[in-house]
A protein has these predicted regions:
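Non-heme Fe(II)/2-oxoglutarate
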Residues: 6-96
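Catalytic core of non-heme Fe(II) oxygenases with the double-stranded beta-helix
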Residues: 69-84, 90-207
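Catalytic micro-motifs at enzyme active sites that drive phosphoryl/nucleotidyl and oxygen chemistry
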Residues: 4-8, 189-191
Length: 207
């Protein structure tokens, strides 16, 4: 499914991005969904004036410091997914999908958005040369089975630093992903959540 969408990703404008439904095998997805980690003291606030959410690292990992070992507080399915994303096969397939050569996982986080959370339009590499990018693309995978039809809160793609320039916003957040390349113009965000259904997701980057 994923590699079949590579041309769409690479040709999309104003920068490469792609939305994919059912990127994860259905049975495996069900196990990930059922064992998505509950909120405890391992989660931390990612709030500032531009955004609001809570996040959780995998095991002893931090941004730009991936440690490929089990997290015994998580299910075997989450450990399998994490180890797969650290594999040569995963980086090769993501390189083929995006057209961007990557060799390793750079970050992996659980991200939970709830009512009142948001992320203002932003881009990660404004004024930075491509050879100095911290990572080459970002992927968010959603686990929100009961997401209200058409509700705000999925990570959108925009043409600029204003929500009036949104060109794509996912509204099916049950086993779906959005991936976008990192450029100085890779504007994205998520609209203010007005409903009570949470948005469980993971976010990972590669370099």
């Amino acid at each position: 499914i994923i590699l079949g969408e590579s041309q769409t990703f690479q040709k999309n404008q104003p920068f490469p991005y792609g939305f994919i439904k059912n990127p994860i095998n259905e049975k495996f997805y069900e196990e990930l969904y059922k064992t998505y980690p509950s909120v405890d003291d391992k989660w931390y606030s990612a709030d500032d004036y531009t955004r609001s959410s809570i996040k959780r690292h995998f095991g002893r990992c931090k941004a730009n410091n991936i440690i490929d070992e089990d997290d015994t507080s998580l299910s075997e399915y989450w450990n399998l997914l994490f180890h797969y994303l650290n594999s040569k096969e995963a980086t090769e397939k993501m390189s083929e999908y995006t057209g961007l050569k990557v060799t390793k996982l750079r970050s992996f986080n659980f991200v939970l958005n709830r009512k009142g959370d948001f992320n203002l339009p932003h881009s990660h590499h404004v004024g930075i040369k491509p050879e100095d990018y911290e990572y080459k693309f970002t992927v968010l995978i959603y686990f929100a089975k009961d997401w209200p039809k058409g509700a705000p809160g999925g990570t959108y793609i925009s043409e600029g630093e204003d929500e009036s320039t949104i060109i794509f916003e996912p509204t099916d957040l049950d086993n779906s992903w959005i991936c976008f390349s990192e450029t100085p113009n890779s504007w994205h965000g998520s609209r203010y959540m007005t409903h009570d259904v949470p948005r469980p997701s993971i976010q990972f980057t590669m370099v």
